[in-house]
Each structure stands twice: as C-alpha cells, then as structure tokens.
C-alpha cells in the first residue's frame, strides 16, 4: 500500500492531523498556496498586494492560471485588474486577451527591498526569490503559525494570542490597509489580517501541550483514522488490469513510504483503485477534452445525492433502530465483485486494536441532539441541476427536537461537517462510532471522485504516485464544488448527506460558525456564475489537477495536463458567454478560496478529535 511521506501535508480531504513533529502542518504552506517549487509573492506596489508563483523550473511564468493555488487577489470581484497596479507584464498570457492583469509582479531578490535591520540569513527564499510576509508585505523570516510571516508579525500574533489582548476598536470600520510602513497604526486590523491570511490560533496553544501528551493524542487520532481507512476494504475495488503492477514513475522510483500510515479516511485503497501509468497518448483537442470530461461528470456524479445516503423507505427505520445507514450501491459495485477476504481480516485486526480507545470514548458525555428538518429545500436551478430531493426528512424517531437545550458540558461530541450524515453524533454514540459514521457517509463520494479522475483525459498517463497525490490533496476541494448546491444562501440553511437541513444559526451554536460562513460565502460566489454542467465538470477537473501540490514526482507532466484543462475551460466559458470576458477570471479566483476552505476543514476535524479528549 502506497503511503504519503510525512512532509506531504496538503490539507487534503480528510487530513485531520499532520506528522507528530509539529502541529502547524494542519495549515502547511503547500496546502495554502504552493509546494517546494511554487511560492506566493506580494507585489512591490504599495497598493493591493498580489501573489504570483514561479514556474516549477524556477523561471517566471506569465500565466496566472499555471499554478492556480495563487490567483492574484489584485483582481477585483468583477474580474477587472486593480487600478492600484502600475505595471503589467511585458509579454502576453495565453489565458488573457492582450496582456495579463496589471500588477502581477514578483518580489525578486533585491537588496533595496530588504530592511536594513534584518540579516540576509533570516530571509526566506524560494528559487532565488524572496518570500514576503502574508500580513504586511515585509520580508518573511520563515513559516510561522501556518503562513510565511516576518519576525514582527510573528511576535505580534504570538503576544495577541498568549496574552489574550483586546485591542482598541478600529476608527476606520476595520478596513485599514496593513503594509510594512503602517502595520503598527491599527492593531485590531493587523490582528484581523493575521487571522484572515491563515495564521492559526491553535498553532500557539497546541504547541504548548507537553510533548508526551501531544504524542498520546496524535497516536489515538492515528488509530481512529486507521479503522476508517479500512472502511473501503470490504467493498469491491475498482477495476484494475490483473496482469499489471504499479511501476515507478517517469522520474524514477517512488520515495520510501513513511513509517506511520497516512491519516486519511477513504484513501488507503487508492493504489488498488487506480491503474498504473500507461504510455502517453496523443494530446486531445479542446473539443475532445470538453466532451470527455463533461460526459464523465454527468454519468459519475449525481446531483440528487441518491448515492450518498439511504433510500427514503429505510432512512428513518435505520436510525430509529440505531443502525448505521446503508449506502446505495454504486454502478461499479453492481458488477458482482466479491469483497476481499484479506481486507476483511485486516479490518478485524484494526477493530481488536481499537478496543481500548472505544472503552475510553464511552465515558464522554452525550452529544448534541439532532435537528429537525426545515421544510425548505433547493429547487432545480436555471441550469437544470437537481440540487436535492423533493422530500426533507425529520429527525430520527425517539431523539430530541432541535430546540432542546445543549446537554452535558463543553466536551459534547460534535462533528459539524456538511459532508457528514449529521452535524453531531446520535445519542449514545462514542467518538469512534461517530468516525465510523463519517467514513461510511464519505466513502461513496470519495469513490466517485476517483472514478471521475480516471476519466479525465491524460490523468492515467501520470505516474500512479502523482495520481494518488492529486486525489489525496484535492478530493475535499472537488467535493466542495460538487456540494455547493447543498448550501441555500437565501434561506441560510445547509443540507447534510442525510438529506436533513439545518439552519446556519443552529450549526453556529455547535461551534461551526467560521467554517460554515466560509462555505456559504464560497457557494454563493460559485453559484452566482451559473455554470453549465459542462463548465462545472471542467472546473472540477481543473480543481483536481493542480501542479502545485506537494510531493509530486513529475510536476512538469501534471502542469502540462493542467494547462490543457485550463485551455479547454477558457474556450468553453468564452464560447458560452462571449460578452462576459471576466467570467473566466472570476472562476479562477475561486481556486484560492477552495484552498482556504480545505485548510479550515482540516483544522475543524482536528479540533473535533482534540476537543473530544
């Protein structure tokens, strides 16, 4: 079984914990913007800071879509270039008419840019370029609390958290521009900027836990993930040529596996589900890419979510009796493939090893009671997408209504993730059982992403290592695009995979306010673009195939495939609405938002496990 290197923490779909070395892996630089070959850099202009990554070879690239983890935020929400940018690239981009948006400059190594008080040994460089502080734009001294930051902002954030400082209210409606020369003028806005760029509150508190205690918690979390990793084992693996075996990628043999299993739910079977790399096929035309991806998206993904939950007839019966809901069989499970006995035995051994964790978990207080369903639901939109079933089911029989007071104390067991069956554990459920429910509800969606990836033209030409890396890092972002229709921005409700809707206020009371607000905001922006089914399919492929993921064996091949998909997406968007020239740019601006959501989701799941201790 292929496992990821411990440094390959991309904030993936269910990357709940990083390596046991340090906690800030939860918001790693790779998952925020780029990997070791791609970085984020601010513009030298003093207006709105911009970010523009170098190419994997270290040379500058003029293409803002080449490494979409760092789409320049200097573009306005309407897609037009910011007026504060005073210069533009001298050569044109293949993704923009004429020249790329102005202000897309990279902070090159410049002795005049470095502040005199800082020695060159404290400057963080990447491919000969200077990394700038994400907060104020000064020269970054390293990766601090989840982002690249200077010494000043690192110390400011640490003091703010450790001393719990309440700063004086901003006099400019909390809209101060934080740059190096004025970063000390408004401390409230500076602290707000620290949080908005991804500095983690938990990175301070978690780091002060004694080493032995932290290792114990991480070991227990790892054990919980191992059981979930085997939920796919008893199901039929996707078709794999029986006479072929995984072969090394084109760049040489795969790196040795990490000593500990990868802490990912539903990903342990990726090497068995994916086919070995094949000989490169002729590059398809734009029309071929559009048609193949659109067909795969239409046939594999189900907007009615029929395959993600139970059927209406047995939904309430299962939960009333305390049984875990059964998922509807997928098309690849209907081929009559029997489960693998070896995988079943492995799952049984994991169950035996986790008896002690279950016993410890049984002493936790009862969880938040489930919420009653709202009587509103998404209706089919103008594109004809079926956003949800016409029936919304009430809370399971025999359990408390939604307006019941919170039971127990602050350690209630919560897993308020929209991609779960419920935002909480059912009555009497232990932490381990909640994890099992979560894995069972997530597994079908993950398998659909794997099947979709296999139908992307050129994806199976990549090495198997790179295929697995892309899937582990990007599956959550793909599912976020797919499940954007679960969020009803107008009614402020969200539908979980159990087909039950909850209001934003209810979920906020469960401790999920920040993540849900960010998901609502992303869903509103994405839905406002009114993507067609073909556009949504191609955008989903672009989200998955990202050359700036950490741990790639052959970044050049992934980048080439990414550019092919981007060209097809741009051609399709301009073909459908030729008058809306900024629509493609707006769509690309959603990519860094997905990276942020990916990290927030990983932190939420980690805090769930830590809070339950």
From Swiss-Prot:
The keyword Nucleus applies. Residues 49-285 are annotated as: Crucial for activation of GJA1. Residues 1-48 have a biased composition (Polar residues). Ubiquitinated, leading to its proteasomal degradation. Ubiquitinated by the SCF(FBXW7) complex when phosphorylated by CDK1 leading to its proteasomal degradation. Ubiquitinated by SIAH2; leading to its proteasomal degradation. Rapidly ubiquitinated in response to inflammatory triggers and sumoylation is a prerequisite to its ubiquitination. Residues 1-70 are annotated as: Required for phosphorylation by CSNK1E and cytoplasmic localization. Residues 1-102, 233-286 are annotated as: Disordered. Gene3D superfamilies: Erythroid Transcription Factor GATA-1, subunit A, Retinoid X Receptor. This is Nuclear receptor subfamily 1 group D member 1. It comes from Bos taurus. The lineage of its organism: Eukaryota, Metazoa, Chordata, Craniata, Vertebrata. The gene is NR1D1.
């Amino acid at each position: 079984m292929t496992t990821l290197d411990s440094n390959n923490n991309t904030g993936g779909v269910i990357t709940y914990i990083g390596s046991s070395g340090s906690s800030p892996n939860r918001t790693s630089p790779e998952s925020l913007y780029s990997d070791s070959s791609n970085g984020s850099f601010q513009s030298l202009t003093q207006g709105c800071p911009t970010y523009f990554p170098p190419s994997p070879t270290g040379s500058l690239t003029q293409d803002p879509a080449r490494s979409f983890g760092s789409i320049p935020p200097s573009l306005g929400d309407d897609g037009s270039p910011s007026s504060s940018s005073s210069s533009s690239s001298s050569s044109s981009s293949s993704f923009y008419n004429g020249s790329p948006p102005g202000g897309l400059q990279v902070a090159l190594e410049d002795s005049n840019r470095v502040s005199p008080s800082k020695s060159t040994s404290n400057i963080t460089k990447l491919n000969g370029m200077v990394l700038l502080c994400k907060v104020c734009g000064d020269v970054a001294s390293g990766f601090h609390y989840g982002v690249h930051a200077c010494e000043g902002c690192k110390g400011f954030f640490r003091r703010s958290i450790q001393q719990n400082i309440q700063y004086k209210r901003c006099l400019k409606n909390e809209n101060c521009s934080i740059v190096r020369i004025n970063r000390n003028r408004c401390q409230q806005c500076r602290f707000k900027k620290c949080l908005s760029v991804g500095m983690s509150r938990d990175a301070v508190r978690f780091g002060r836990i004694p080493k032995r205690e932290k290792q114990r918690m991480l070991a227990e979390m790892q054990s919980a993930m191992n059981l979930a990793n085997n939920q796919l084992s008893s199901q039929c693996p996707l078709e794999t040529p029986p006479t072929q075996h995984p072969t090394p990628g084109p760049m040489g043999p795969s790196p040795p596996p990490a000593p500990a299993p990868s802490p990912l739910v539903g990903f342990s079977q990726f090497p068995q589900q994916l086919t070995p790399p094949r000989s490169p096929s002729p590059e398809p035309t734009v029309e071929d890419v559009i048609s193949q991806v659109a067909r795969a998206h239409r046939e594999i993904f189900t907007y009615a979510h029929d395959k993600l939950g139970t059927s209406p007839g047995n939904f309430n019966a299962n939960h009333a009796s305390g049984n875990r809901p059964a998922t509807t069989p997928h098309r690849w499970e209907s081929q009559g493939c029997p489960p693998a006995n070896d995988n079943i035995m492995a799952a049984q051994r994991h169950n035996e090893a986790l008896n002690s964790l279950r016993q410890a978990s049984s002493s936790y207080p009862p969880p938040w009671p489930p919420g009653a369903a709202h009587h509103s639901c998404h209706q089919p939109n103008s594109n004809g997408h079926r956003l949800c079933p016409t029936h919304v089911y009430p809370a399971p029989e025999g359990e408390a209504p939604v307006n019941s007071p919170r039971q127990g104390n602050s350690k209630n067991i919560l897993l308020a993730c929209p991609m779960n069956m419920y935002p909480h554990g059912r009555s009497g459920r232990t932490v381990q059982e909640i994890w099992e429910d979560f894995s069972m509800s997530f597994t079908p969606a993950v398998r659909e992403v794997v099947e979709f990836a296999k139908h992307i033209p050129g994806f199976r030409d990549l090495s198997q290592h790179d295929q697995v890396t892309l899937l582990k890092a990007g599956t959550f972002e793909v599912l976020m695009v797919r499940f954007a229709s679960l969020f009803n921005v107008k009614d402020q409700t969200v539908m979980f995979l159990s087909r039950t809707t909850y209001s934003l206020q209810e979920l906020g009371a469960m401790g999920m306010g920040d993540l849900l607000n960010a998901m609502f905001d992303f869903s509103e922006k994405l839905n406002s673009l009114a993507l067609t089914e073909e556009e949504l399919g191609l955008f989903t492929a672009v989200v998955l195939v990202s050359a700036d993921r950490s741990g790639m064996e052959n970044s050049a091949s992934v980048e080439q495939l990414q550019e092919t998909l981007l060209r097809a997406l741009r051609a399709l968007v301009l073909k459908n609405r030729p008058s809306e020239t900024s629509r493609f740019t707006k769509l690309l601006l959603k990519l860094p938002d997905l990276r942020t959501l990916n990290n927030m989701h990983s932190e939420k799941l980690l805090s769930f496990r830590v809070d339950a201790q």
